[in-house]
């Protein structure tokens, strides 16, 4: 359940019709703005799939900050599957920062399975800096990209696990 959204003159955040997630539209040539897309699960037994699509206009330069935290003190697993798709217009530039964390002293697992898919037009650039901080029992990360001429994707990924935690 979404608790709130804030659009600006250049960035429109729209809930998906008939589904879970958002469409984020960034107007062409938008500069020096940022978008925050947090997710938080505070109950055990929750399983959600969220689809967020970022439509970045030509020549736009923005920063997107996203992430999920699961606080699970119960005995049933909690799962967040965030599927983010980026549609980058010609000559656009995106810095995408994503952080995940799990906590809680229950026996239920904290599972986060992110997917990131990029379609970049000519000379578009996206830098993805993703971090899994701690406490996530299981994660399966999937990334894909379809790049136009001169387009660039840079992926920096840090995943911290301990004990019986797994990451793929």
Whereabouts are the PLM-identified features?
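Conserved beta-strand/loop scaffold segments within soluble protein domains that form the structured core
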Residues: 6-168
């Amino acid at each position: 359940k979404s608790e709130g959204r804030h659009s600006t003159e250049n960035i429109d955040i729209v809930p998906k019709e008939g589904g879970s997630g958002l469409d984020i539209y960034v107007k062409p040539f938008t500069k020096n703005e940022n978008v925050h897309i947090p997710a938080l699960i505070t109950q055990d037994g929750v399983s959600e799939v969220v689809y967020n699509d970022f439509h970045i206009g030509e020549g736009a330069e923005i920063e997107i900050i996203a992430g999920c935290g699961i606080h699970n003190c119960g005995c049933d697993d909690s799962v967040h599957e965030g599927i983010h798709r980026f549609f980058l217009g010609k000559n656009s530039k995106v810095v995408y920062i994503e952080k995940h964390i799990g906590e809680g002293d229950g026996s239920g697992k904290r599972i986060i399975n992110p997917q990131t898919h990029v379609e970049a037009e000519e000379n578009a650039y996206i830098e993805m800096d993703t971090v899994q901080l701690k406490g996530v029992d299981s994660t399966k990360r999937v990334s894909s990209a379809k790049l136009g001429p001169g387009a660039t994707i840079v992926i920096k990924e840090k995943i911290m696990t301990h004990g019986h935690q797994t990451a793929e």
